[in-house]
Structures are given as C-alpha cells and as structure tokens.
Regions:
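Conserved phosphate-binding elements of NTP-dependent enzyme cores
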Residues: 1-912
Length: 913
C-alpha cells in the first residue's frame, strides 16, 4: 500500500492548479487564512473524489438513494482511501434525534431494557408476572352478562408486507372472518394490502355472548387464539368498539392491565408501539402561550396589548371589540388600563373565557344591529381550537407566533408510553437513565447488579454501552445527557459526537476529514480531543484536519499551509512539512504565528464603558444556578468557561431572547430568569452568527449589505439608461425586464441526470452573465453591471472612490478582511466565517446610535490568527462608537483583548452554572 496520497492539479474554487502530497496514517493539519482554499482542497476535492469513487462502485439501484458527488476539478488523486467527512454543517435539526440516538447508544439501551427489564403495572406500579389461561378466562367472565364478544388471535402486529400467506393459512384452517387494521373482512373475499405499509391482522376464532355456561367453549377458543399468535389474545367487546389485550406473557393481577412481551421497539419513541400517543414521541407539544399573546404589558387593550391573530383589531365595529366591550361591562374594568394593572381574575377571563357564564354582546354591523347572549371561550382556547381545525398552512404559521413548546402533559416530556416507562433495569426506567450525564451513566452501568442469568444475557450489550459512553467522555462531552436533543448542540459538540461514534466503529484504513473539531472546546478539554484523534490515527487511519488551533498544529505529524492570502490571493501551498519545518518557512503567516514572531498584541488601554450596567438577576435556564450577572455597557465583554458550563444558556437563551422580545418586539420566550435591569440604555439587540446570508445563489454580499441598490441606482442615472428609459429595476436579476429570461437571471441552467449528479451549465443565451443584451449595453466608466458584480471588493474600491455611499460600504467589507470576495459571489459559496463578517460589515456601515448590543457566539470559528486580529479590530470599532459587544469565546487571543470577562463554571453540565 502507498504511504502517501498524491493530489495533482487541483483547481476547485480558488485553488491554482495545486499539487500536494499527504502522508498516510498520520495526523495532518490543513491551515491557512479564512478563504484561502483549505476547505476547497479538503472537502471539495479530496473528500468529494473519495466519496465519488466509493459510490461509483455500488449498483445503479443503490446510487439512486445516495447523494452523488460531482467529479472535482482535479487531474488525478493517487493513493486515496474511502473518505468519511465530519464537518459542522450536518447537525441534525430533527426534533426526534437525541444524543442517544445519534451515537446509537440508545439502540443498545432498548435491547437491554427489552431483555433484562422488569415490567411493572403502569397503574399501580406492582411488578407484573405472566398470565395463565385460567386467569384470562376469569377476567373475561367478569364482563356484564349478555355482552357480545369476539375472541381474536393477533397474528400480525405492525409488520410491513402483503401477508397473503397469512390469509391463505387461515382459510385452510377453516376460519371465516378476520380484522385488518381495524376493519372487518370476510376471508372468502380477496384482501389486498399495501406492501410498504405496516399492518395489524387479527383472525376471529370465536364469537360468543357472555353467559355462565360458556366457560368451556371460551377456554378452547382462548387456547386456540393463544397458540395461533404466540401467547396473545384480543377480546373485542362488540358494540363498544373496545379491545382487551391479554397476554400469556405479562399482566397485573390487581388492575388487570396486560402488556405485550418486551421488545426493543417498545422503548423506541420513533415507533408507534413505544411512543407516547399524545405527542407521538416528541416529548413536547405546541401550546398557546399567554406571554406571547400580550408581549408588552405596559400597553392597554385599546393600545393594542393583545397581538394574537384575530384579536388585535380593536376598531369599534370589529368582532374582537364587541367581546372586549361586553367583558369590560360585566367584569367592571376599563379597556384603557395597562395590561399589567388588570386583576388576575380579569386576565383569566380574557385568556381562558367565562366558563359557561353568558355575556350580553351588542353588535352594530352593516348587515344590521342587535343583541346576542353567549359565553366567551377565551383567547387561549379560541386560538387552540382554530389551530386544530384549520387546514391552511399560512393560518397555522400565524397562530404558531402565539405558541411555544411545552412538555407533553401525558408523558411529562419523557417521550414514551406509560407501559414502556413502567419497565426498569436496576430500579431505573429507560428515560431516567437517559437523563443522567455521560459520567453518571457510566457509573450506573459499572455498579449495576443483575442475577446470574440476566448477566449472561446482558454481558455483551453492557460492553457496547460502556465503550460508547467512554468514547463520549474521551472527546470532552462527559457533561451531556443522552436525552438531550441533537438540534440544541453546538457545531463543535455535534462534530465531536460523530467523532466518538466513528471511534466506536473502530475501522482502519479510512481517510477522516475533520472541520475544526476544537470549536467550542475550552483549552482544558482540547488535550482529550487530541488524544482521541491520535487514537484514531494509531488504529491505522489518515486524519486530515482543517484547523487553526495552535495546540493541534503543534501535535500534528504534518502541516500543510494554504495561502498566502485569501480568495484570489490564495489557493497555493505556502508550506508543507513538520511543525518545525513550517515555522522556518519564509512567507508562511502560520509559521510566523507558531514560532511567536507574530503575536496579537494586548491592548494598551481598555475601554472603561459608559458607567451604565445591564444586570441579569436569577438566571436559571438549563444548568444555571440562579446567578446574577452584570455586563458593563459600552465595552467588549467576553463570556468564557469550559464546554457545557452554561455560556449559551446565559447569553443566547436568556439575554438575547429577552432583549429581542423587549427591544426588537420579536415573539420569543426567554430562558428562565427573574428579571433584567438596564434595558432602557439600549435600543436594539443584534445577533451576528455564522448562518448563511442567503440560501440561494441569488443572494450575494452586494444584495445583503445594500450595495446592490446603490449600484443599480447609479447605473439607472447614466445618460445611456435615461435615454432608454431604464429604472433601477432594469438592473436586477430577480425581476423580469433586465434579466436573461432563458435562465431567469441565474446565469446557470440545471440539467437533471438520473443516476448521476445534476449538472449546472452556463446559460447559452447570456453566457452566464445573468442579464439580457440591452441591459449589458449600459456602461458606467466602461463597465457594465455584470462586470461590476464580477469585481472583487479590492478592485471595486478605486473604481467607486468618488461615490461616498458605495465607497464607504465597500471600505467596511475590506476592513473585515473580505477584500478578495467578488461583489456578486453567490452566498452559498461563502464559509461561515465569511458570512459572519459580511454581517459585521453591514452593521459597521450603518449609522450608529451607540445604544446597540451585539451578541456573537464563537466568532473565531474558521478564522486564522491573522483573521482573528482583523476581527478584534472590527469589534473594537463597534465599541468605540459606544455600542456593547458580548462574545462567547474560548480563543485566548480574543479573551486577552476583552475589556470585561465573565467566567462560568467550574465544570460542564451539573457541575457548572
């Protein structure tokens, strides 16, 4: 086997025909400035080719179901293994995914509870034993005399297929009737079932009327049904549409509650046999939230305090006003009283109705006027009812503005049906186990006491559970619980979970490509992560890690530095070799920072702030322990702490959502806290995250920052455009008129290729220029609109230097280090760090009131030390004009330049907050 991977002539995105040699079975770090072409080399070239070759080896039928990669723009790659990419973008937003399901630990837990669990009665909690035929007969005979019943054998329960053989066997055995998915059939008719749907089939063994003398016949029928279905009998009470399930397997003698034999699917909240029927296994339900109906309690009803759909129109002839007038008269309150001064009784009547008491309603409509007498259902009940009844998606979305998620009242947020939760191992049900942190769960498994027989059954299952929990601990995630939703994890956490899952599979000879696994990790947890990556390497795998973290670079076997600049100024290999060799390579910015020749300076003086404070009292969301926090306004504040210590809970869940609701009038529910003081010194809150600035190729930095409007107006003001009668709309590629209609302004046409990836080809009519010929004939300083959009920010600065509005916006893009980005570059091709800096530039170009608070969650993600320095300068500019910046960060360079630090801890999870 070759000892290296050789890439020849890589030209993807901004790569300049690069040749590179990567040693196999080593920890290799790819580094370089943001936008220099690291991801293009690692993900778009090496991973794409490795994945493509693997998928091409499969059958054409299998290829239909797998996303096909395009062949990357590269001459050839030699010595490539199957590639597995672990990046940050693929966090599951599915509400059904939890840490347990993603790591597959939950599958082993379901098996453990099904095989060695002790069932209890869900009603009285008593341990359940199996039922005998005699016990079943006694219970059936307790039904009232003359009750008509059917004794049925449930032969198929929730299995896919047409099940033709089941019906054939039943006919041969002389049975006449059956019930399929709740519908009765005659076995003489042809029963066609859908092959890919799950079905329930019960064969009718006997039909009886309850009398004293039927015991013997009933016994025979129950025995036959039990033998047919392997121990289960269904007694259907005719006329009541009620089924009683009996099991020779498990039932409670006192309550008569039967449960079927324990199977792993009973413990799955993604399966109808295990999921709570009320919330279908989600653990939460959408409920109308009074806080969102009346977001601002300082207003009165007449001033529009109630913002709920259908109740916000307070015009004197409206339906809502008719009800409010009647309520005010009956319960003696004034409609101009601020909501916060209304009594609890009055608020209760407005929200939850008059509970049957009638109101006298006076209506005066164009159709006539008169008086009505009727009860009022209350705004909350009205919204709930309309939500259940409406068929319109738009109406649903409008009503959801007044709703928030709350734990399901049936299962208390535990996702499973009560029968499943009544099964215990070591005294715990499966949900209680999943609510333990990884450390506590490991401790529980280590000290689990089982009988000798149980131990023999559970031995291999426990071994798998222990090893997987151990891997989660080894990547610094010991504070997570298995029941935590995958959607609530940060990018770094979800990436390390998938890393732990990969170690669990213990493959060798694989090429792993990782995208900044150290994100969101405190320096303390970094060593654990490095050890994990070295373990993966020692198994015989090659690790290619895109990373800026200094510790990781020093621990690497080999470093490849891509650069020297970003965008068009990058795309070359500046240095490659061991960390020592890179440090001594002239022209490598990475080498200069690693060797200490370049450093980010500590500021000479720190901002004192404006003397005002923003105070949070009693913060208690997630693991926060009723803490009080002060943030000095007009400063650059850094919130630090180990992973899982509560930083995001404090900043994103409480601070951002509360300020968003109060200052920006956004309908969100903030995390648990007592109160916040100091909001009056602020006028808005802005969260600058790394989400894309647009989801389609039509959005670009020019459209996002507002530059494009100014550029279109500039073109519309030229003599040529005026003579032709063109307005600014003519120069938009999103509307008819100026754009090329063949590609509708995309510049590309999508050609669907079945079994092969879709191909995008430049439009033949406009040659990829997005506009029609007439529009492109209008020039400004010798360039048409397409050529202007193709300029980079650096090229556009001298071109527009006499136009202050455009020049100032371009200057801010250049200041945040995006000089290499084209004005019309599709937003889908920007990295997270680049998208975040486009947003920062947009903020910098606005007129500042000096009363804004900016919130950033780990802004150094994807940034090289050189870029971090630029970022710090930009954030200082926001602070210099009086704004407040709050940053969650682990990067020591950012922390040392902050004016104020809030450190949470001391540990993650239960040990933090």
């Amino acid at each position: 086997m070759q000892d290296h991977i050789y890439v020849k002539g890589a030209r993807e995105n901004n790569l300049k025909n690069v040749d590179v040699t990567i040693p196999r079975d080593k920890l290799v770090v790819l580094t370089g400035l943001s936008g220099s072409g690291k991801s293009s080399l690692a993900f778009d070239t090496i991973y794409a080719e490795g994945q493509r070759r693997y998928v091409e080896s499969l059958s054409s039928y299998a290829r239909m179901f797998l996303g096909q990669m395009e062949k990357p723009d590269v001459d050839y790659i030699d010595g490539l293994s199957p590639a597995i990419s672990i990046d940050q973008k693929t966090t599951s937003k599915n509400p059904r995914s939890t840490v347990g399901t993603v790591t597959e630990i939950y599958d082993y837990l379901r098996l453990l509870w099904a095989r060695v669990g002790t069932p209890h009665c869900p009603v009285c909690g008593k341990e359940i034993k199996q039922q005998t035929i005699d016990q079943i007969i006694d219970q059936v005979l307790e039904l009232p005399e003359a009750t008509r019943i059917q004794v049925m054998a449930p032969v198929i329960r929730g299995k896919k297929g047409e099940h033709a053989k089941v019906f054939e066997d039943a006919r041969r055995s002389g049975y006449v009737r059956c019930r399929v998915d709740g519908i009765a059939y005659d076995l003489s008719e042809e029963i066609k079932l859908e092959k890919n749907k799950k079905h329930n089939i019960e064969i009718v063994v006997d039909r009886l009327v309850i009398r004293e003398d039927i015991a013997r016949r009933l016994t025979d029928s129950v025995e036959i049904a039990s033998n047919l279905s392997g121990g289960l009998v269904v007694v259907n009470v005719v006329g009541e549409d009620r089924d009683i399930l009996f099991s020779q397997n498990y039932a409670c003698e006192d309550c008569g509650v039967s449960i079927e034999e324990l199977t792993p699917r009973m413990f799955s909240f993604n399966n109808p046999y295990g999921a709570c029927p009320a919330c279908t296994g989600l653990g939460s339900q959408l409920k109308v939230d009074p806080e969102l109906i009346i977001p601002n309690k300082d207003l009165s009803i007449l001033e529009g305090a109630i913002t709920a759909s259908g109740w916000s129109n307070i015009k004197s002839d409206g339906i809502a006003r008719m009800y409010f007038d009647a309520l005010a008269k009956k319960y003696r309150f004034k409609l101009d009283t601020p909501a916060k001064n209304l009594s609890p009784e009055v608020m209760d009547v407005i929200l939850y109705g008059t509970r049957g008491e009638e109101l006298t309603l006076h209506y005066d409509q164009p159709r006539g006027k008169g008086t009505l007498h009727q009860a009022f259902e209350g705004i909350c009940n009205n919204l709930e009812r309309r939500y259940k009844e409406t068929q319109s998606d738009a109406m649903r979305r409008e009503l959801e503005d007044c709703m928030s998620e709350c734990p399901c009242p049936t299962c208390q947020g535990r996702r499973l049906r009560k029968e499943s939760l009544a099964v215990t191992v070591g005294g715990l049900d499966i949900d209680a186990f999943c609510r333990k942190s990884v450390t506590q769960a490991l401790d529980f498994v280590d000290h689990l006491e089982l009988t000798e027989v149980q131990m023999r059954i559970a031995e291999r299952i426990l071994k798998e559970i222990k090893s997987r929990l151990g891997f989660l601990q080894s990547v610094g995630l010991q504070y997570l619980t298995l029941s935590r939703g995958a959607g609530s994890l940060s990018g770094g956490e979800s990436q390390r979970i998938r890393l732990a899952t990969q170690i669990g599979s213990s493959l060798m000879g694989v090429l792993y490509i990782l995208d900044e696994p150290s994100i969101g990790l405190h320096q303390r947890d970094n060593d654990m992560l490095l050890k994990t990556m070295q373990d993966l390497r020692d198994l015989g795998n090659t690790l290619l890690v895109v990373e800026h973290d200094e510790d990781t670079m020093r621990a690497a076997d080999y470093i490849i530095d891509v650069g020297p600049g970003a965008g068009v100024h990058g795309g070359e290999i500046v240095a490659a070799g061991t960390p020592e060799e890179v440090m001594n390579t002239p022209g490598s910015i990475t080498g200069e920072y690693l060797s200490g020749r370049r450093k980010i300076p500590v500021p000479r003086e720190r901002q004192k702030g404006n003397g005002k404070l923003l105070k949070v009292f009693g913060a208690a969301e997630n693991n926060l322990r009723h803490i009080d926090v002060e943030i000095p306004l007009g400063t650059f504040t850094c919130v630090t702490g180990v992973s899982g210590s509560g930083k995001s809970s404090l900043v994103n869940e409480i601070l951002y959502k509360k300020l968003g609701a109060d200052l920006n009038r956004v309908k969100v529910r903030a995390g648990r806290h007592d109160r916040i003081e100091g909001e009056e010194f602020l006028d808005k809150v802005i969260d600058i995250d790394q989400s894309p600035i647009g989801r389609t190729p039509r959005s670009n930095p020019a459209t996002y920052t507002g530059l494009f409007n100014d550029i279109r107006e500039l073109f519309a003001s030229t003599q040529d455009a005026k003579a032709r009668g063109y307005g600014p709309g003519r120069f938009s590629f999103n509307t008819r008129g100026g754009r090329c209609e063949a590609c509708q302004g995309d510049g590309l046409l999508k050609i669907e290729m079945h079994f092969l990836p879709d191909i995008y080809v430049p439009c033949e009519v406009c040659k990829g220029k997005r506009y029609n010929r007439e529009t492109l004939e209008v020039h400004y300083k010798g360039k048409n609109i397409y050529e202007v959009l193709e300029m980079t920010v650096d090229e556009a600065l001298p071109f527009f230097e006499n136009l202050p509005r455009i020049y100032n916006r371009l200057k801010t893009l250049e200041e945040v280090g995006l000089g290499y980005v084209k004005l019309g570059q599709a937003s889908t091709t920007l990295s997270g760090g680049e998208a975040q800096r486009v947003k920062l530039a947009t903020e910098l170009s606005k007129r500042s009131t000096g009363r804004t608070i900016y919130i950033l969650d780990e802004p150094t993600t994807g940034l090289h030390s050189y870029d971090v320095q630029r970022l710090i300068e930009v954030l200082q500019k926001l602070v210099d004009v009086g704004n407040t910046v709050v940053v969650i960060e682990h990067n020591l360079d950012v922390i040392k330049t902050a004016d104020h630090i809030i450190d949470l801890g001391p540990e993650g999870g239960d040990g933090g907050g």
